[in-house]
Amino acid sequence: MKLQVAIDRVPMERAMEIVKNITSEANIIEIGTSLTKEFDMRALRPVIEAAEGVAVLGDIKTCDEGKYEFDLGYRCGFSYLTVMGSASMGTLEACAHSAAEHDGLMMIDLLECDETRIERISGFTDAIYCLHTSTDEGSTADPVAQVRAFKTRFPQIQHLAIAGGIKKHHLAALSQENIDIVIMGSAITKADDIAMACRACRKEMK
């Protein structure tokens, strides 16, 4: 299980500081939607470069114009990009093709997708599907139960991530559930000592 640390709602300078504090422990650094909207993808290249070889995900939440947005994101240096599960099949297919062309990775955000929708879009075998409880909704009460229920319902989906209010005490149990990525944000990025918080979370995953 990989640890993805999400950076959101901070100035560019603070984003750079956070990146430098987590590169030794995070497996994936997420440049959150708020930053991609405020600064645009091209302007975020210095932040990507500060990651020093750690994979960087751009949480661009593509809904349309899949090829254009994904091509741009990969050219800017992102390794992973996100598309909404609610996007059209045409958009999802365009994003998948772009990911293949650029040797990139696609994450499908399942925010507000019901079971019928998930079933319909479950055929992207190289994609990572992200169980996502929104910031506005609040945190997931039991992420382990959520993962187990999802895997029982959709055994055909082989690559899974989870996001939304994940805390350090969830990690040991989640690491036993054979998921690809756990995504954490403020539990790490708002800590007094970000590097120490990230290190402590990694230890819980072993």
PLM regions and their residue ranges:
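Conserved N-terminal beta1-alpha1 strand-loop-helix module at the mouth
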Residues: 1-67, 75, 119, 189-190, ...
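Conserved anion-binding
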Residues: 3, 65-157
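Glycine-rich beta-to-alpha transition loops that act as phosphate-gripper elements at the mouths
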Residues: 8-9, 58-67, 109-114, 159-169
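Structural motif
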Residues: 24, 76, 124, 176-178
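Hydrophobic residues within beta-strands of alpha/beta enzymes
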Residues: 29, 81, 129, 182-183
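Short secondary-structure boundary segments
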Residues: 33, 85, 110-111, 133-134, ...
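A C-terminal functional module that forms or caps the active site or interfaces directly
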Residues: 54, 144-177, 181-188
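C-terminal helical cap(s) of enzyme catalytic domains, especially alpha/beta-barrels
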Residues: 95, 99, 175-176, 184-206
